[in-house]
Design a protein with these regions (language model features):
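Amphipathic alpha-helical segments used for helix-helix packing
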Residues: 91-113, 117
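Hydrophobic/aromatic-rich alpha-helical bundle segments in the mid-to-C-terminal region
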Residues: 132-182
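Short, amphipathic alpha-helix enriched in basic
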Residues: 1-38, 46-53, 57
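Residue-level detector of well-ordered alpha-helical segments, enriched
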Residues: 8, 25, 51, 55, ...
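Hydrophobic alpha-helical connector segments
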Residues: 66-101
Length: 182
């Protein structure tokens, strides 16, 4: 079951472009990848948020793999955060419509608590990869601020039609500049 939850999400995202985050998308992805429906259905039995959460978890895993300590060690903290946030957008650039549909589902009132947990998990992971070891109030404020930066930049990314997402990168840079003014 865990293997299916780790393997299938990017393929569900590919199908979500056409079918939304639905059982139809899940089943089409499973069929295309040779995964039995009897395994795919219970792996995502709590509906769209299960599929979306697993997809975001997959992106988290890609980010961990892409940023080993030796790659990130030479960067300044600001550069680390910028690179980590930018990576997440690059990882889903070909699935922006799936991301757009996912954000709509995540914004539903019934999903806000889980969305907040997912956002926190992602911000925490980025800070940990960046080398943050804070355990005092800074631990919490850094993650809350990064969640806001990431979320607002995500909205800019969804509407960005500039070459190589230059507008998104510029937006991210401005948000980081805003945070540095605190």
């Amino acid at each position: 079951m865990d293997e299916v939850r780790q393997f299938l999400p990017p393929f569900i995202a590919d199908e979500a472009v056409f079918d939304g985050w639905t059982p139809t998308a899940r089943d089409a992805a499973a069929a295309a990848q040779g995964v039995e429906a009897g395994l795919a259905t219970p792996a995502f039995d709590k509906g769209p948020m299960d599929m979306i959460d697993a997809w975001i978890g997959h992106i988290d895993a890609q980010m961990i793999e892409a940023f080993p300590p030796e790659r990130i060690a030479a960067m300044k903290i600001r550069e680390r955060i910028r690179a980590l946030v930018a990576f997440r957008f690059e990882a889903v650039a070909h699935q922006r419509e799936a991301l757009r549909r996912a954000t709509a589902i995540m914004a539903l009132p019934a999903n806000l608590a889980r969305t907040a947990r997912i956002s926190w998990r992602t911000a925490d992971l980025m800070w940990r990869l960046a080398g943050d070891t804070a355990t005092d109030y800074n631990h919490y404020t850094k993650r809350m601020i990064l969640s806001g930066v990431y979320g607002s930049t995500l909205m800019a990314f969804l509407d960005d039609e500039s070459p190589d997402f230059a507008d998104t990168h510029a937006f991210l840079e401005r948000r980081i500049d805003n945070v540095m003014q605190f």
